[in-house]
Amino acid sequence: MKLMYALWGSRLQEALFAERLREQLAALGATRLQINIADADVAPAQLRLTTYEQPVGAIVSVWIPDEFAAVTGLLTAAADRVAGWVVDERTPIPPPESDNGVRADALAGLALLRIPAGMDRSEWLRRWQDDHTTVAIETQATFGYVQNTVIETLTADARADALVEELFPMAAMTDPHAFYGSGGDDAELGRRVSRMIESTSTFGASTDVDVIPTSRYVYDLTGVRPTG
């Protein structure tokens, strides 16, 4: 199963990248760890949205068959605040592989989506995954696209129904043409932006959404052994 957590805190960089955390997760049976952190490398990113008092500082993903409560406990100890979910992962565009523990050469944008009041979950999923996916791929310069639908909450106040990760060129932090893949054509940029806004509005992703620009790190935990 894939677990995902939103974390807040002033010591996330130190706590999340500590070797000890990887050892503890591996000891629980975790096979893979992904850290998406809002760090200095993505500080220039212009697209940021938050529904919380403080923006999310990191999104952590853990692949593990069980021991969900123990994983939640480890990450709770690493942060000031944690929200966690069990998710069902879909990969319309599989992200490129990167070296173990090395920053991916990308702006990794994370979005927390919520079902609008009055909309049925099945209809929301249809509009998002069936209708919008193609629009997102055709209007943006994404080279990695992962959709994570929440199937269970792991913490209180974990208010999200899906978490989306999209990888963009680093230039997309400040250049709309690099973000939308419009090749410097202002008219094409406008067309793509309009199409994207129209599509996101059909399933509530234009409001009540968090957007977090991050750096992406992936660790293979299958060979990690506790040192004591």
Located regions from the model:
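Macromolecular interaction modules
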Residues: 1-228
